[in-house]
Amino acid sequence: MVSELTIKKWHFCQTLIQSIILLAVLILELVKQHFSLANKALTSWILILILAILSCLQFTLLKKKQNPHRRLVQFNYYWESFSITLSLQLTLYLIIIILNKYHILTNTFWIALATLYSLIMYIPMAKLALSKIKSTWGRILFPASIMFSLLLSAPDTFTYTKKIADWLIILNTSGFSGGIIFVIIMLIAMHNWGFQVPNWRISKRASKAIIGIILLFIIVKCLFNGFNASESWTSILTSWDFHLAKSITIPIFDSIKAGFAEEWLMRFCVLNLLLRYFKNYHNQILWAVLSDGLIFGLLHSTNFLNQSASATLQQMLGACCAGFVFAAIYLYSDSILISMGYHALYDTAMAITAGSLTMTSPSAFDWQETILLAIIDIIFAYFLISGSRKDTIEYNLRCRKL
């Protein structure tokens, strides 16, 4: 394990280099502009002052003794997690532009190198800022609402030109490489918050019959999500469309990213934090599953930006109830791999037929179908967390000290 002193040295070097680069680029750009002397000087000093303040705040993470319970200190941890994530990707972007301008090697080489480095460059932020957050709800909502989207979009910032290898465009624009970054960062944070690494194998207490039912449920649900083309109840079992969309590479990678990154966020991070929060509640498991599903549904509200309001509301309802099932499957099987696989297959089935994960405005029948599937999800999720299945879940939680 890398020592905190080494992490602090790493953070110091990154912060110093990024400050120098940002200031150098700022000065060069201002010199090029045709401002009056007074305006140019004023603008320069204001921007340099802002950058200096931001840099100084980032250096505060190097202080040896800080009271982690002080509100100002806690606020700084939130702020630095955000500002470091933003400034590092901006710095890499500017470096790539400069290297490209002077034709030093190829775009593909530098963007590939930047993508590789971005996999580890946020580690000091995770260790020195994000993992120091104390509030349980802060640990839940801050990564889910802000850090998730920031980190997933970070490598896409580098892909400012299409004059690079196709595989690099796919990895970065789909959010696949950003998803890997998020997994690494949250693994560090969760470790520092006292959580174990999630299991990949199925719990030895899980019934083979129940696992079989889960797998059957997954197959049927994915088939309906991707290939059922019915427009009325009379054709619900007879109308199927197995044609593939013309361009499916990026949607497939986007779906796989959703599978591993969103499940890492919602089931490994959020659900475990909720289980600890509700530990002394009478219905710990039920409250955790309900809260996890509701948060998962609410996170889809951001899709208002690229699709209709009715489509987003439909998606939020479906995601909320699907979240109950994802959580119940994870808790019963004790395997993050099953929930990841289900989520990835569910989205892939839709992506390869529609060519996108963006939804169109739903018809009256679409709403009826969504409500029916939501009810089925709720019933199945409750089945998995009740009766003898609940005993298995409680055993799994004891093994993970939850």
What does each of the following model-derived ranges do?
Residues 4-13, 25, 29-42, 58-64, ...:
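C-terminal membrane module of polytopic membrane proteins
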Residues 301-317:
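Interfacial helix-loop-helix junctions of multi-pass membrane proteins
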Residues 27-42, 97-118, 123-145, 154-264, ...:
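Juxtamembrane helix-loop-helix connectors linking adjacent transmembrane helices
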Residues 167-174, 280-292, 335, 361-369:
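Membrane-interface starts of transmembrane alpha-helices
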Residues 273, 297, 315-328:
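Hydrophobic alpha-helical segments embedded in the membrane of multi-pass proteins
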Residues 261-291, 328-335:
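Membrane-interface helix/loop boundary segments of multi-pass membrane proteins
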